[in-house]
């Protein structure tokens, strides 16, 4: 297979065994922390109503459904296995895994309000990650390790699997980009504010991602193509947040 889209054969098998056979929350017993940058581009009109409604409102998209890609650039991060008592995997802890400098992307399809569940999700993990770090990221971003992403485990109804890919993140003059060759060409640009050179922000939010969001839109031909989907989010709602997450 193309190395840019190859499946994480060993890691995904381990991840699925832990997640579906043991059916335990936080199967690796991870304690984790991630600081970095979060990008999202969806098919809603600018501005998506999820941040203000906390995911309760019907998407303000042409079809009432939410299609999106998410990108997480981890500037600093770690995951650590900590066993106390019951250990379903019957092995020693792998200790601290460095997640700094890695990228993660998500393809997400939601049939209605974000908080109503029924998600179809595909996960993409940086090929630079070690197998242990990839396992940890799969557990974190499937919601099994608690923290800010913990609610994902209640929302995901159809998991499309994990792919390890070359993933790049860049900050541009007018926005940000997230790229996976042959899959994601994600580009967003911030909306200009009243004051020249200033961006539009929404602050003091209870939103799960972060309390402050920079309002953005999809740049020309911002799109994702995978798992039978071909979505173009040019002009669609987008957001950028600086994130500081931890779990459980």
PLM features: residue spans?
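Basic/polar N-terminal segments that are highly enriched at the extreme N-terminus
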Residues: 1, 16-31, 246-248
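Short, small-residue-biased leader/transition segments that mark boundaries at the very start
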Residues: 2-15
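Residue-level detector of short, conserved catalytic/binding motifs and their immediate flanks
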Residues: 12, 42, 121
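Short, flexible beta-strand-to-coil junctions
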Residues: 18, 75-77, 180-185
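N-terminal ordered "arm"
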Residues: 26-79
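Short, positively charged
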Residues: 58-85, 94-97, 105, 205, ...
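Internal, well-folded beta-alpha domain core
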Residues: 98-248
């Amino acid at each position: 297979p193309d190395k840019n889209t190859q499946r994480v054969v060993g890691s995904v098998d381990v991840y699925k065994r832990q997640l579906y056979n043991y059916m335990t929350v936080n199967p690796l017993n991870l304690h984790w922390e991630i600081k970095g940058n979060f990008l999202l581009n969806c098919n809603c009109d600018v501005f998506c109503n999820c941040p203000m409604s906390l995911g309760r409102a019907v998407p303000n998209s042409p079809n009432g459904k939410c299609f999106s890609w998410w990108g997480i650039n981890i500037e600093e991060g770690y995951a650590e296995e900590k066993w106390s008592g019951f250990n379903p995997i019957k092995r020693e802890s792998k200790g601290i895994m460095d997640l700094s400098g890695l990228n993660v992307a998500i393809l997400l399809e939601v049939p209605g309000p974000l908080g109503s569940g029924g998600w179809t999700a595909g996960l993409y993990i940086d090929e630079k990650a070690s197998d242990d770090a990839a396992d940890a990221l799969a557990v974190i971003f499937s919601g099994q390790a608690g923290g800010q992403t913990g609610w994902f485990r209640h929302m995901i109804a159809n998991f499309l699997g994990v792919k390890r890919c070359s993933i790049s993140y860049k900050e541009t003059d007018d926005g940000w980009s997230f790229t996976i060759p042959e899959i994601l060409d994600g580009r967003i640009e911030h909306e200009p504010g009243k004051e020249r050179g200033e961006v539009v922000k929404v602050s003091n939010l209870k939103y799960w991602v972060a309390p402050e969001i920079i309002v953005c839109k999809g740049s020309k031909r911002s799109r994702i193509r995978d798992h039978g989907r071909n979505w173009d989010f040019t002009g669609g709602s987008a957001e950028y947040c600086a994130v500081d997450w931890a779990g459980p």
